[in-house]
């Protein structure tokens, strides 16, 4: 059976991704000084303006406007002709403390209030909700090929801009990859779409030629391309106005780019700007950790796990496994393995994945999962042998 599946990525200069990076840069700056801080930091941006808002409870001081400007500078918006200037943009902040009603459930979980006293039980989930984790063995990164290749292309777009290879490129950009599957195995790349912001002086013909040579051919394996592969490079013909000048940006608006490109399900909660007591983030990371280790252990070729939590309660209210017909054992047995091998209470997730550290800004562009360029705790294959004891 033949089918097509498409996923997209965006560069760090995309306005939504700018906001994700600013929110996580602020989170990291706070965690560096106060690892136990509670942070829920949202950012929005438009022409000449960055606004930071949210709820932050901490005992430290962070110069938020300075963090904002440094982050925007690193992305590459450092002069007016790019449509946004880190030195002259306006930065507004409006920050409150975390609600006392929420804090009381996170500070002491329901289990702890009922007498189950230990350090892990003391941390309740920061909200209700469901989170999904996914892994597949179709790539070495245990990620679906469409999102994996889309991220590689968007990262390469930024590399050739920053190292001067294509110095006419600007920070904003998007990529999209359509993969043809045959019998549920990736066979070839059917379509590649790349839209990149550029200087006014360069022709579309040069952009098309350079993007194929320095971006696509540099990262896409030749065996995945053929004479039928279609390329759409800046298909509107012009992309000079970009970044916050072209579109407003908002934290948490690229949640599918952040995860599995639509190949796996998503619970709806965004990651950036949230400390690890927020299960939207920490439990989604744990779910990826579980799924990746299960697939690497040979439990299934493709696996998705759903976790669900109640606010103020430590233990998940449900765990569900889907193997899409690739499992080597019944799914209820896999759930038992998960319960025996992984402690999925928020306090245990924070402990086992070391999530009090300021490691989040680096995840805020090019995906939180399958990052072979980073050493992220939830990507480590450190539970395989323990899982195999139950097979």
Curated annotation (Swiss-Prot):
Top-rank taxon, per record: Bacteria
Localization per record: Cytoplasm
EC top class, as a word: transferase
Binding site for L-methionine: 55, 98, 247, 278
Region feature (Flexible loop): 98-108
Binding site for Mg(2+): 16
Cofactor: Mg(2+); K(+)
Function: Catalyzes the formation of S-adenosylmethionine (AdoMet) from methionine and ATP. The overall synthetic reaction is composed of two sequential steps, AdoMet formation and the subsequent tripolyphosphate hydrolysis which occurs prior to release of AdoMet from the enzyme.
Family under the similarity heading: Belongs to the AdoMet synthase family.
Protein name, UniProt field: S-adenosylmethionine synthase
Native species: Clostridium botulinum (strain Eklund 17B / Type B)
Top-level taxonomy: Bacteria, Bacillati, Bacillota, Clostridia, Eubacteriales
Gene for this chain: metK
